[in-house]
Amino acid sequence: KTLGDEFYEQLCSMLVFDALIYNEDRHFGNFGLLRNNHTGEIIAPAPIFDNGLSLFNFAMPDDFKNLSAYAKTRSNPYRISYEDVCKEVMGAKQKAQLRRIVDFKFTRHPSLNLPEQRLTAIEKQLGERTRELLSTPVQRSAKRKNEPER
């Protein structure tokens, strides 16, 4: 929080996104900050990167028959449930971001796709997961400018 409200909001959004896509590899070495090359001043959070261990990349074809059950077996490196993380970081901004993707569908490429059954199963699970995360109570509110710390 010492870097400011916008940094904190973006960190919270990253953690909620990780919960949405079941990112199994978010750790302290794969998110960062952008700095001014001349002054070293921190200017912004880095864009989200290193999401390769998500969207059920380890799932076998049989796992897609009941992806909801398989999803419950996935976790982050710290073994803290995605739901518990979201309970701590969910705010109005994250809820608004989730509402924008509730009906997400992958854009199909003419020739470079995962199998259609896999894409459809992931889309369905993401929709269910989005609705589930939207039911997470907002535990914090964004501080208004010039509002004193409590």
Question: Could you say what each language-model-derived stretch is?
Answer:
Residues 1-23, 28, 32-150:
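Anionic ligand-binding catalytic core segments
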